[in-house]
């Protein structure tokens, strides 16, 4: 059985983008929520800073979606190559 590469890439993009969005929005409401996670992501994604602003939440969401898209596509491609 092979993975549909586009479907898995899109699913991973949605999940990781939503994870970044929800964590960022929760951090705007409750300042200590997810702070360590967001600081870790700011060290991974260039141009993203873990400051409490809506613009940074949008940037983090876009980075998360792009990261999930690429990661999901690479995972599905590798899986299909070896199975």
Description of each model-found segment:
Residues 1-83:
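Juxtamembrane/disordered regions of integral membrane proteins
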